[in-house]
Amino acid sequence: MDSKNQTAAMGILLTISAAHFLNDLLQSVIPASLPVLKEANALTFAEVGLITLTVQITSSLLQPFVGAVSDRHPMPAALPCGMLLSGLGLILLAHATTLPAILISVALIGCGSAVFHPESSRTAQDVSGGRRGFAQAVFQVGGMPAPRWDRSRRRLS
């Protein structure tokens, strides 16, 4: 890969890494908001557990299926679509006042994450220029600080 292509590839990798940070930051809002949601909506611990289960099922268990489809039919539009789904879920969560509305909101956040991760990882591999380990590492670094940043920010509040 020539210098110009390497620069472009690094730009794409850094953009995907930054998007990974934002995606994981959006998802880390859910556990941080559980105490507020519980109190504001008089939820039981079982209902809070259902919120957590919903986001885990949609974000984690859906990912392999999205990845399998992405392998056969690359979907570059999945990156912004995943971010939009997560963003929409977060906006809806901010206005949700019933358990079903909360569950739909967190399911959208989880689905957005499930759509974003496989395609963004595939894109990182595609622009790696044969440096797959490096490309994957740059992509992973973006997602690593989001939950930790959110936890440290909450401690300071």
Predicted regions mapped to residue ranges:
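Extracellular/periplasmic helix-loop-helix junction of adjacent transmembrane segments
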Residues: 33-60
